[in-house]
Amino acid sequence: MNNSYAGPSSASADASATRRNSKRPKYSKFTQQELPACKPILTPQWVISVFTLIGLIFVPIGVASLFASNNVVEIVDRYDTECIPKNMTDNKIAYIQNQAINKTCIRKVRVPKDMDQPIYVYYQLDNFYQNHRRYVKSRNDAQLRDEKKANETSGCDPEKTAANGSPIVPCGLIAWSLFNDTYTFTRGNQSLTVNKTNISWKSDRDHKFGSNVFPKNFQNGTLVGGGSLDLNKSLSEQEDLIVWMRTAALPTFRKLYGKIEVDLKKNDIITVVLKNNYNTYSFSGKKKLVLSTTSWLGGKNDFLGIGYLTVGGLCFFLAAAFTVVYFVKPRNS
């Protein structure tokens, strides 16, 4: 008589196996790290070829970048130290804070090479930390964008309200410290007009500064900061403010003041009548006026070209070094 009963030990083993199988994850090549992979073998020929190719690409780019940078004509004139009366050179802060003193200063600059229009006019500030956390946060973007939120001044400390408690529009330290030096240019008897339209980012004008938001109580606080604003123009039209409020990442920066749309010839003498209003003396800052042309690469900047040439030259050197080693001491096969 056949007995088909397996007994309790067999049933227990089957149950244990079932439990183990139920906990096993679904098999896939991805989870088991069995995907096909490419493992290139770095032979001397490959390494030499790659370094040579990188050098062949980077060196021409570096040469073209340096050539473009050298074609940019740039005039830089530091005027903060030159535009102080001799009797006040030892007390610069008192000079700049005294509203009764005439701050007009006349500078003459010579054009070193022909400058084709448009010629961009910048002001450059040194040792001005616009990236300071408290400074960067001292603004209210909702207020700048929407007239219905003119009373919102959160985040604008310490320039939130005027002496009578009314909200300041635009509020905050960034707007309060608006750059307010001015420049006018003449060449001989010819006045050079500075075009100040479209000097800011279009996205800022269209989306960050409202066309129906107008200045209120600006520079009416107990301590006057920088420049003033036209009360009859909306914030989206006040491009000097828009340019200034796009804060710089580094303590030395340039901001666009305007464009001169006539050609300047070599050895032309440009007379600059400027108002030295902005206080950089209290923090040992520097002010410079910059006139510059541009190239397909932008303004004058040798760093990019030098960087490409350095990397390309290093790759050529490594390719040559590997070639010498490969032929002098070849690897045994």
Q: What does each model-identified segment do?
A:
Residues 101-242:
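Soluble non-transmembrane domains of integral membrane proteins
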Residues 67-89:
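Alpha-helical transmembrane signal-anchor/signal-peptide segments
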Residues 17-42, 84-97, 283-294:
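Membrane-proximal N-terminal segments immediately preceding the first transmembrane helix
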Residues 109-113, 232-237, 241-268:
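Exposed beta-sheet edge/beta-hairpin loop segments within beta-rich domains
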Residues 31-71:
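Internal alpha-helical transmembrane segments
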Residues 121, 257-291:
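Extended, hydrophilic extramembrane loops/domains of integral membrane proteins
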Residues 297-333:
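Juxtamembrane interface at the cytosolic side of transmembrane helices
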Residues 92-103, 245-252:
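Extracellular beta-rich ligand/substrate-recognition surface
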